Amino acid sequence: QVGMIHTAMNEFGKQHDGYSQAPMSVCSAMSQGYIGYDLQNGIRAELIKRGIYKPVSTVLTQVTVDPYDEAFYTPVKVIGRVMTKEEADAEEAKGNHVTEVEGGYRRIVASPHPVAIVEIDAIKALMDADQIVIACGGGGIPVMEQGYNLRGASAIIEKDLATGLLA
C-alpha cells in the first residue's frame, strides 16, 4: 500500500505545479490512517452486531529506527509498481534504489529493525481503558530521533518485527 500511495502522490506532484512529492514516511502515515479507519469501523460494526459495546481506537504509530542500521546501506524491501528500464534509470538518477524483477524493475527501500514505539504509553492507556487498539499498522511509521524532533525515514519496517516489539 505504501508503495502505491507513494507512486500516486509523486505522479500527481509531477503533473501539477505547486504540489511537492510526498516523503515515504508521510505515505506510511496515510496507509496507516486509511487501513486503520477501515479496520476500526469494521471491528466496531461487528461488535455492535454481536451486542458488544466496546470502543475501538486506531493510533497512528511512529516507530524509531537507528539511522546507522545496516539496512539503510543494503535496501531490500520491494515497493511500488513494476517499471521499465527507462523509469528505473530515472529513479536511480533521483538517488533511489531499484532492483530487477520479473517483468521489469521495482524500487527497493531499507527495512531497518524497529527500536521503540513512540506512542507506546498512549496505546497502553487505551488498553487499560478496555479499548480495542489498532496500532503499528504496516510496521509503523519509521522515524529517526534528531535532537528533540522525529524525522521520517525513507524505509519500511517489517510488520512482524514491529508487532513483536508491541507485544
Task: Annotate each language-model stretch with its function.
Residues 6-8, 147:
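Short secondary-structure transition/capping segments
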Residues 24, 77, 141-146, 153:
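A sequence-level detector of short, solvent-exposed, charge-rich linear segments
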Residues 106-110, 118-119, 142-145, 151, ...:
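Generic, ordered loop/turn and secondary-structure boundary motif
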